[in-house]
UniProtKB/Swiss-Prot annotation:
Organism in which the protein naturally occurs: Meyerozyma guilliermondii (strain ATCC 6260 / CBS 566 / DSM 6381 / JCM 1539 / NBRC 10279 / NRRL Y-324)
UniProt activity-regulation remark: Inhibited by organophosphorus esters.
Family per record: Belongs to the NTE family.
Protein name: Lysophospholipase NTE1
Taxon lineage: Eukaryota, Fungi, Dikarya, Ascomycota, Saccharomycotina
Keyword set includes Chaperone: no
Catalytic activity: a 1-acyl-sn-glycero-3-phosphocholine + H2O = sn-glycerol 3-phosphocholine + a fatty acid + H(+)
Length: 1438
């Protein structure tokens, strides 16, 4: 056992000792192997390989080839190289430009409207409907709103009840259901409304006429929930307890107090019916079989509001006057043509007031002006100085005091001791009507009693005694009360003007207000809608006794009704309620010194003027003329219409003119001038001073507005009551397709887009004569369907002053289109019932509206005739008038030259004759105050200011010069009809992303047209750069390239340009270059420029056209102004092969005569020349590039090498394609400096395609592809051929682009219309002999090719005839009949023919005055725009 163990240990020890020896042996073997391998490799390279090479080189080879083999090899190699170069290298342009253009994403029609479907559902919340209706008062602050609505009550009207609307009870609002409002038409009861008895069918609906007894009521309007039932004008009488007596011209406030229920009962017929004067003028009833709920604000709430918050009262009065002007007067004058109702206001105003100035005051000013006129030789109206050296101090008047008037007329030498020159005198002219002064002489002044300056005493008896017993014979004298004759005259004039305006010192609406405080603390109030009569108030002073108090009971409970109703079914009237008593809220009369201060302020604003005979002081259609008071003489009021002047009436001494113009800010409807045979002396209060004083003394607005209301006729107030003032936010829908046409709209401000669904409903005629939808054909639920741009068609737009929907109203049909507000807009809605009522009373209205509709339909028919050649076009861009009212200039990012751009655009708009104003934040704040955008209350004033500007100016430019988060930025976006999005063309970062202002534009979801204005430092566009801007901006509808310098500071702040490596390397090489080489290069450069100048002078007739600077007619801002103002000039060049070279001469002649071009379009060769002009906008490059192309196309060898087997065409098209590509390169149509389009014939879809985007060479080649000669160009699977097959002169498409004037150049072959008569059969041999027979009288019969060509151009011939008759077209046809289609080798000859023809034609047109007055062509424009930046006309070399 031990031996075994010891042996094992021995073996293990041996193994451990032998292991290191084995490891060393393996390592040595590896080293030896690697060494041996390296030796073998080195040996092979150093010994074996050289030996092999030497052996091979020492051998001899011999190859024998025949000549034919060598030639074949060379031909094969050459062919392979040619094919590789020809189809691999030389066609790279085709493969690069064949990539599909990124199509813009189709937008959802839901994006056009922000209106949610849930909002279309009628809300059952009374408060929501009430808040919607109370917006007619403008924005009301919290306390004011609470005071106005704290005593509001509701009344429910059942379906079988008729409501007698008494507007003196309060202001009512429909919060649930629909009310039908009727007006009494007693004057038509025996004629028009009974016409059906005579066999005439007037087609009244069942609900149009309501009979109560013998009285007939005609439907006036339907008031839906959320709309006021009361007239806004009626609120003027709710603020005061002194009710104005009813007059024949008064409307709306007819009380039921004089009418009993039995008299108004339907079963009361015959002679027992009440007199027509006692019957209510306005009644209402619920529509259909559903009840209606009214919310009523009692009149006491308005009186309390007037007492506590007089400033809020002035705001409501401002809203009333604003609506009166914007809605009622604009509609009545501009659309309905009832100008007499408006002009009668001022005539009646002067007829009611016959007072004149005292003779002792007027005589002095008359003598002074006549003496000044006789002594002065300078032309103009002498004006009296505003104030004399003596200051008038407004002091508190005592009962026994008077005025001490120093008469300047009495300080003459002829009256040295006249005692009457220093006596206290009255300013009233009617003193002698009540007083008798003995021993009156001619020279003595008229001594009168003062009635307008009576001080209110604390005692009523003292006040009465002062007003009655005040007499000049008992007055004392006071030196402190001394006046000069001038100050007394001014005060007397103010008093006379106040009398006209309805301002009286005794008016409680004036004297109960303290102008120094806008509000007072809230007094105690009675809560509860049942106590509308405020019977618990102890402070009621002198309540007015109501005539029907005995038959009325007080509203003691909530269940009693405010308005009286009559049950139609039971024919029993409800118990008459007692009319609430008028409340006079407590308060003392203000100090007379306040009113004296008011008159003194107005007196300071008066300007005395002498008007020469026949001189006009107010021009028709002018704004803010002010009020004129006639002191002496007379003024003629003249209305001009259709070039004829008509004298309406004469304003004599003591009258005023300019009343409505100054009062509500409307434009003057008449011209006012002095009589031809005599001069006039007037006192003038400028409009801006009047507005300033009215704002200061705001409590004067209420009596002025009440006086105006009393002057309006009943018909005017009826129209005002029924008209609706609609406010539509941007993106909201005004009317939907398929809705009943129950009225038409007149656009007051804003813009609407007309949209039509391509899958319309199917209307069927019903028995009643109305169109209804037949839903039985397709019962498909489309309520949740989203419509995309492919499902809708944009038909056009409606702008300021245009009317919408008359045709549907006249034909009693459904709406055919959908109207969407482009921006925040306002319309005046004329209900169908009101229109029918007015048509019965005034047939002239129907005649005028019929003419408007007929003119519109006639224009539409002419446009449809014009569009007939384009019935097959694939262009879906509608004709939309680009005469934008408001233009917003919005940058993409900050630090862009927005203000400089706006200044240049405004200057250009003025240069073309537009009345334009630019608005930025600073100018708006200057006019409206620093809180114009911060207070919600200022929104009314802001919108009113914008509306006034839209009425006064043709174009308003909103300059967005504020940060993104500014309120002014959002205001600019919301106010724009067209938004010009400014961008720096070199800003690559913004091009591929979205700017900060663009994000706000997207967020606001505006639907206004948005055009991208790319600003370039030079007239050069990098090929392909424009599409980068446009491909991701689906909200951009167009773009313009504008040359304008951007300051270096702005450039660095906008972007950090990347310096190309090549440019940097070139700069370094230039710095290190030899000075001698630099001088040599400069010398070569100078020679090159000199040669270019020579070439330009040769082309432009011996240097007549300057090469030194940009001509005025090529100014980019003038071009942009014409496009935005619908004054654009379009150039259309027709097709005709080589005859189109004459287009080059015509274009150069246009440049010579300074005729601007804004849009370019063409067909075939016209698309080529037009593309050159639109791309370069320069005649030098056009001439050189066109000549280069003509030389290439006319090359015999190029044509020969391009021939192919004529299966589709005789030529492959390669040489032709490359010739065009050599000219245009990779420039896209979007890169052209001018807006451009060309047409082609799509033989795949049988349509005419209009190309405005994409690679220019490809679509110009498509437009020039003659069938048989060249193969069609394929694009998106369609084959495109020459556009001349359908329209060889696309004038109609240019008209759709908005061009007002179109210069159309036709170079097509003459259509042979020789009569043919060869019988019913034709022999080919006879045709051949007929052509060879020189004595034959028969015309040559066309061959098969001629017939195919004529057949191909049938559509084009008809389109040409229509193009010649298009309005605004200047048709030119150079004498090029002697040249063939392929005579490109005669370039210079054909060019000269076109140039000489156009030059002579334009010269003759100018001399004879036939050339249209194109905006931007006049000498004045050249002078005004001559200060623009000047640079080289051409932008790159040929």
């Amino acid at each position: 056992m031990d031996s075994d163990t010891s042996s094992a240990d021995f073996h293990s020890t041996e193994t451990l000792v032998s292991t290191p020896k084995y490891s060393y042996g393996v390592l040595i073997n590896v080293i030896l192997l690697v060494s041996w391998t390296c030796f073998r490799v080195v040996n092979w390279f150093l010994v074996t390989l050289p030996s092999i090479l030497l052996g091979m080189l020492s051998k001899t080879f011999q190859i024998t080839l025949s000549l034919s083999s060598i030639l074949m090899f060379v031909v094969a190699v050459t062919a392979i190289c040619f094919l590789v170069v020809r189809y691999k290298y030389l066609t790279r342009y085709s493969r690069n430009s064949a990539a599909k253009e990124p199509a813009k994403k189709s937008f959802d029609i839901d994006d056009l409207s922000k209106k949610k479907k849930s909002s279309s559902k009628t809300s059952s919340n009374y408060l929501d409907q009430f808040l919607s209706a109370i917006q007619v008062f403008g924005y009301l602050e919290g306390p004011v709103f609470h005071e106005l609505t704290r005593n509001m009550t509701t009344q429910k009207v059942l379906p079988n009840e008729v409501l007698y609307l008494d507007e003196s009870l309060g202001f009512s609002i429909v919060v649930e259901g629909t009310m039908q409002v009727y007006t009494k038409v007693t004057n038509l009861s025996n004629s028009s409304l009974n016409a059906e008895d005579d066999g005439l069918d007037l087609r009244y609906e069942n609900d149009d006429v309501l009979c109560i007894g013998n009285d007939k009521y005609q439907l006036l309007n339907e008031v839906k929930s959320g709309a006021p039932l009361s007239s806004l004008m009626s609120t003027l009488d709710l603020f005061t307890s002194n009710e104005v007596p009813l007059s024949p011209t008064k409307f709306g406030s007819y009380s039921l107090t004089a009418v009993t229920p039995l008299e108004l009962s339907p079963n009361n017929t015959g002679g027992n019916s009440p007199p027509p004067s006692l019957a209510p003028e306005i009644v209402a009833r619920p529509k259909g079989t559903t009840s209606t709920t009214l919310a009523i604000i009692p009149y006491t709430a308005f009186q309390r509001l007037h007492k506590k918050y007089p400033k809020a009262t002035s705001h409501i009065v401002t809203m009333v006057l604003t609506r009166l002007y914007k809605v009622s007067m604009n509609t009545i004058y501009n659309y309905l043509g009832l100008s007499k109702d408006i002009l009668d206001c001022e005539r009646n105003l002067n007829a009611e007031t016959n007072e004149r100035l005292p003779s002792y005051l007027s005589k002095g000013i008359i003598e002074k002006f006549h003496k000044t006129e006789e002594s002065a030789s300078v032309e103009g109206s002498p004006t009296l100085p505003r104030r004399s050296t003596v200051n008038l101090r407004a002091l508190t008047r005592q009962a026994s005091s008077s005025r001490y008037v120093v008469l300047a007329s009495r300080s003459k030498s002829t009256h040295p001791g006249d005692l009457l020159s220093s006596v206290p005198l009255s300013r009233r002219s009617d003193y002698y009507e009540t007083q008798t002064i003995p021993n009156e002489s001619e020279d003595s002044p008229t001594i009168q009693r003062s009635s307008l300056r009576r001080r209110a005493s604390h005692s009523t008896s003292l006040r009465k005694s002062n007003s009655v017993l005040e007499d000049i014979r008992v007055r004392g004298f006071s030196n402190e009360r001394e006046e000069t004759e001038e100050t007394s005259l001014r005060t007397a004039i103010v008093e006379q003007i106040f009398t006209h305006l309805g301002i009286s010192e005794d008016d409680p609406t004036v004297m109960n207000i303290n102008p120094t405080s806008a509000s007072s603390s809230a007094s105690s109030s009675i809560v509860g809608i049942s106590k509308l009569n405020y019977g618990s108030l102890d402070s009621i002073n002198s309540p007015r006794v109501d005539p029907m108090t005995s038959i009325r009971s007080s509203l003691a409970s909530n269940g009693n009704k405010v308005y009286q109703t009559i049950n139609q079914h039971t024919k029993e009237a409800d118990v008459l309620q007692e009319k609430p008593k008028k409340v006079v809220l407590p308060g003392s009369r203000g100090d007379d010194s306040d009113f004296v201060a008011v008159k003194d302020e107005f007196a300071r604003a008066i300007q005395m003027k002498y008007i020469q005979p026949g001189k006009t002081i107010i021009e028709q259609d002018s704004f803010h003329t002010g009020i004129f008071y006639v002191i002496d003489g007379s003024l003629d009021v003249i209305q001009e219409s259709n070039g004829k002047s008509k004298k309406i009436y004469t304003v004599k001494a003591g009258g005023i003119t300019g009343y409505l113009n100054c009062l509500i800010g409307m434009k003057s409807l008449v011209s006012v001038k002095a009589s031809e045979d005599s001069s006039a002396i007037v006192a003038h209060i400028p409009s801006h001073m009047y507005s300033k004083l009215i704002d200061k003394f705001y409590f004067l607005q209420l009596p002025i507005a009440r006086r105006l209301k009393r002057l309006l006729s009943k018909q005017f107030l009826t129209i005002d009551y029924a008209l609706e003032w609609c406010h539509i936010s941007a993106g909201d829908i005004l009317s939907k397709e398929g809705e009943p046409a129950n009225g038409f709209h007149i656009v007051l401000s804003g813009r609407f887009r007309v949209v039509k669904f391509k899958t319309p409903f199917k209307p069927v005629a019903s028995k009643a004569g109305h169109d209804t939808y037949d839903y039985n054909d397709n019962l498909i639920d489309e309520s949740n369907k989203k419509y995309t741009s492919n499902d809708v068609e944009i038909l056009g737009e409606y702008g300021h002053g245009e009317s919408i929907g008359e045709v549907e109203v006249l034909t009693a049909s459904l709406r055919k289109n959908t109207l969407i507000a482009v921006r925040d807009s306002e319309t005046a809605r004329i209900p169908r019932a009101l229109f029918e009522l007015l048509s019965l009373q005034n047939p002239s209205i129907m005649v005028k509206v019929s003419r408007i509709v007929a003119n519109r339909l006639s224009k539409k028919d002419s446009e449809e005739i014009l569009d007939k050649p384009l019935a097959m076009t694939s262009s879906d861009s509608p004709y939309i008038s680009s005469n934008f009212k408001t233009i917003t200039i919005l940058p993409t990012v900050s630090q862009l030259p927005v203000r400089e751009f706006a200044d240049k655009l405004v200057q250009a708009l003025k240069a073309i004759g537009r009345n334009v104003i630019a608005l930025d934040q600073a100018s708006t704040l200057t006019h409206l105050g620093k809180h114009a955008f911060d207070e919600r209350l200022a929104e009314l004033k802001l919108s009113g200011y914008f509306a006034y500007l839209e009425e006064k100016y043709e174009t308003i430019v909103y300059v967005c010069d504020t940060p993104v988060k500014s309120n002014w930025t959002s205001t600019c976006i919301s106010q724009g009809d067209c938004i010009l999005l400014l961008a720096d063309a070199d800003d690559e970062d913004t091009a591929e992303s979205i700017g900060s202002y663009e994000r706000l534009l997207i967020k606001l979801k505006t639907t206004a047209r948005t055009d991208l204005c790319l600003i370039h430092p030079e007239k050069y566009v990098t090929p392909g750069s424009t599409s980068i801007w446009l491909k991701n901006r689906v909200w951009v509808q167009g773009h313009h390239h504008i040359q304008m310098e951007i300051s270096p500071t702005q450039t660095t702040s906008v972007m950090k340009p990347k310096i190309p490596i090549i440019s940097e390397l070139a700069k370094k090489i230039k710095d290190r270059a030899n000075p001698n080489i630099k001088l040599k290069l400069e010398e070569v450069k100078g020679k090159a420029l000199a040669s270019f100048v020579k070439l330009n002078n040769k082309i432009n007739a011996h240097g007549r056209m300057s090469f030194n600077g940009v001509s005025v007619h090529k100014n980019d801002f003038l071009r942009l102004a014409r496009i935005l103002s619908n004054e654009a000039v379009g150039l259309v060049l027709g097709g005709g092969g080589s005859r189109g070279i004459s287009h080059v001469g015509v274009v150069i002649a246009l440049e010579k005569h300074g005729i601007p071009i804004d849009l370019v379009g063409g067909t075939s060769i016209g698309s080529f020349v037009g593309g050159l002009y639109a791309m370069d906008y320069n005649t030098v490059s056009i001439y050189g590039r066109a000549k280069k192309f003509a030389k290439r196309v006319s090359s015999f060898w190029r044509i020969l090498t391009d021939l192919t087997y004529p299966v589709t065409s005789y030529m492959t098209g390669y040489e032709f394609n490359r010739g065009i590509w050599k000219i245009f390169g990779f420039t896209e149509i979007e890169d052209f400096w001018l807006r451009y389009f060309c047409n082609s014939t799509n033989i795949t879809n049988s349509t005419m395609d209009i190309h405005e985007t994409g690679y220019s060479w490809r679509f110009i080649r498509a437009s020039m592809s003659l069938a048989g000669l060249l193969p069609p160009i394929t694009y998106n699977g369609s084959m495109l051929l020459d556009g001349g097959y359908l329209d060889n002169l696309p004038v109609s498409e240019m008209k759709k682009k908005g061009a007002k004037y179109i210069i159309a150049v036709d170079v097509g072959s003459v259509d042979d219309r020789t009569p043919m008569n060869y019988g019913d059969t034709l022999s080919g041999f006879w045709v051949l002999l007929n052509r060879w027979n020189p004595f034959s009288k028969h015309p040559d019969v066309p061959n098969m090719m001629d017939i195919q060509l004529r057949l191909a151009y049938v559509a084009s011939v008809n389109a040409l005839e229509i193009s010649k008759k298009t309005p605004g077209v200047m048709y030119l046809r150079p004498p090029i009949e002697n040249y063939a289609t392929l005579d490109f080798a005669k370039y210079d000859e054909i060019y000269r023919v076109g140039y000489v023809y156009a030059d002579e034609l334009f010269t003759s047109w100018k001399s004879s005055g036939k050339l249209p007055d194109i905006a931007g062509m006049g000498d004045k424009v050249r002078k005004d725009m001559s200060g623009e930046h000047v640079s080289l006309s051409r932008r790159n070399s040929i």
